[in-house]
């Protein structure tokens, strides 16, 4: 797990520390992080089962950065910089495959055909899909892609995130986070702290200092 300390120089009231901990876990703090790192986009390799992931520590996990989401496979890398869907398509699985002319996106009902490196707006049975595919594995190699709801994504973050007061009535809030990829977890945690700092500045809080360490 990776951790960071946020020091509160505004008294040691337990209620204050609890309030700040709740703020850190709130949508107000987490939503900017989710949007910046495209955390609502989920990629997976259907050729790798759950048992394979448990057995192998070398199984690739998706990487989320401001420029997009990527996932390495044995036949190449998937890179997605944009994936927005209508409400009806949220949390629904789609499959992406490379084709001779670009890519095919399907949910089992609708098939959408597009070009690599170009933004597309598709109109499906249940709404619109906006997607930019920058790269995909070799022809025919499938990639599962899902656009999660904001609630689902923030709940997952909070499951992995620990926010506790360090010691007894110290006024110092300690953050730690678990994840399969240490570099990815570090980036998410750092952005959560930065979002918290930004929110404090917007609240006009000049009494709070923050330190982050890994």
Predicted stretch roles:
Residues 1-16, 105:
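Short, glycine-rich, amphipathic interfacial segments at transmembrane boundaries or analogous
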Residues 14-15, 193-214:
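A short, surface-exposed, charged and often Trp/Pro-enriched helix-loop connector in the C-terminal portion
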Residues 17-20, 29, 90-94, 99-101, ...:
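Envelope-exposed proteins and targeting segments
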Residues 18, 166-183:
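Structural beta->alpha junctions
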Residues 21-35:
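Periplasmic N-terminal gating module of Gram-negative TonB-dependent outer-membrane receptors
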Residues 31-136:
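Alpha-helical transmembrane helix bundles of large polytopic membrane transport and channel proteins
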Residues 137-161, 165-168, 187-194:
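Surface-exposed amphipathic alpha-helical segments in non-transmembrane regions
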Residues 178-199:
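Amphipathic alpha-helical segments
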């Amino acid at each position: 797990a990776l951790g960071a300390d946020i020091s509160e120089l505004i008294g040691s009231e337990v209620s204050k520390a609890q309030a700040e901990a709740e703020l850190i876990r709130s949508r107000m703090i987490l939503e900017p992080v989710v949007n910046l790192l495209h955390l609502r986009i989920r990629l997976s390799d259907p050729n790798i089962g759950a048992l394979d992931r448990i057995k192998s520590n070398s199984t690739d996990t998706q990487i989320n950065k401001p420029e997009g989401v990527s996932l390495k496979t044995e036949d190449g890398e998937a890179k997605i910089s944009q994936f927005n869907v209508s409400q009806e398509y949220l949390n629904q699985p789609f499959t992406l495959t490379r084709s001779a002319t670009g890519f095919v996106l399907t949910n089992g009902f609708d098939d959408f055909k597009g070009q690599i490196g170009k933004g597309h707006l598709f109109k499906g049975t249940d709404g619109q899909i906006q997607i930019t595919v920058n790269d995909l594995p070799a022809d025919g190699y499938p990639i599962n892609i899902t656009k999660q709801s904001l609630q689902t994504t923030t709940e997952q973050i909070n499951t992995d995130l620990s926010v506790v007061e360090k010691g007894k009535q110290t006024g110092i809030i300690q953050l730690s986070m678990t994840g399969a990829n240490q570099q990815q977890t570090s980036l998410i945690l750092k952005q959560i702290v930065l979002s918290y700092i930004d929110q404090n500045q917007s609240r006009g809080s000049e009494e709070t200092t923050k330190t982050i360490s890994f």
